[in-house]
């Protein structure tokens, strides 16, 4: 008998393979959006408390190593997303024995990968901060912060893998519930470690790791007690070489894609670090706000990954085509709302996040937000198409979009930032997004599953 996920009053599995496409995508996406909101709140609460309690220098310390954090964690998160894609395909094909083998193989690959990432960070973080020309007055704080985050990569990866597996079977609600609980804990620990115990920026990192650890424990307990379909037995760990290769290649493809994107951020951070502490502080606050305001398109792209994976497993290319069109229209609507929001309150939001009254901080942060907002439509199409191609099993071609981004950022750092300063930083990503989106859409339109060639 086919085993199914056990229902509970606290769970909600959205059927992405049947029914109205956009409505079901929204139902599935909304918990992911709220989860992303509170996940981002981890770092933003750190930023607000650090900025208001410890000042601009401490805020710049966290901002100066933000791109390194993305590089370390991004690879692990990419691996988790790649593993969840294979699980969603198995679920879409209704092969639940294969699904359990996929979970077992994912645990093995994920553990090894996260330990390797942690070791690489321990060995290379300080030299990398020096290479990025991090200002001397913030170097020690930046190193303590990012080293603590690096030591907690396994915890962060474990949550994202568990949450990804639940979403692979259509359950995006329970990861949200656990994250809401841990987010409240994160705020309490931030205030305790930074404001009361005087642990400085390192206290913010410790609070983030501990609170995410709580969400991991809750997620694992839920899977054990309620979602037996994701609970492999001893026999399922005898994963065949073909499945291991599929898991490895899919996860490495996603991981490399995330790493190349993050490497581009590291390169760009090098250019920003040379513009001074106040510019770094303004950019840090603006990037935090960008992470919030772009979240609707990023959450939809994440939902698109599960949607395409399941329908690929169920052999429904027509449904994939319709879904991608509706996601593109949704991205345009988000961009319009973002433009209105930035015109009304960009400076106020930058001041709220940074706790600063410095004109340089507020002006640069506000300009970054206003100039980027119209391009959210391009970003939405870019992200959804990239996730869709990965979900369709294309492991190489989507990587080239990340290479385009990396090369573009190198060009801006070498030639444009020295001449145009922060204006070049602001325009860098929107211009690159346009090139990446054009390339990815072209690849998508030639995908043999979504657009099969008609027999002559």
Task: Name every feature range the model reports, one short phrase each.
Residues 18, 22-41, 45, 68-75, ...:
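Residue-level signal for short hydrophobic patches within transmembrane helices
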Residues 1-29, 87-154, 196-252, 308-375, ...:
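Short alpha-helical transmembrane segments in multi-pass integral membrane proteins
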Residues 80, 149-167, 175-186, 204-217, ...:
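Short runs within selected transmembrane alpha-helices of multi-pass transporters and secretion channels
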Residues 37, 41-60, 129-136, 192-199, ...:
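Helix-terminus/linker motif at the lipid-water interface of multi-pass membrane proteins
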Residues 32, 36, 48, 85, ...:
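Transmembrane alpha-helix boundary and packing residues in multipass membrane permease domains
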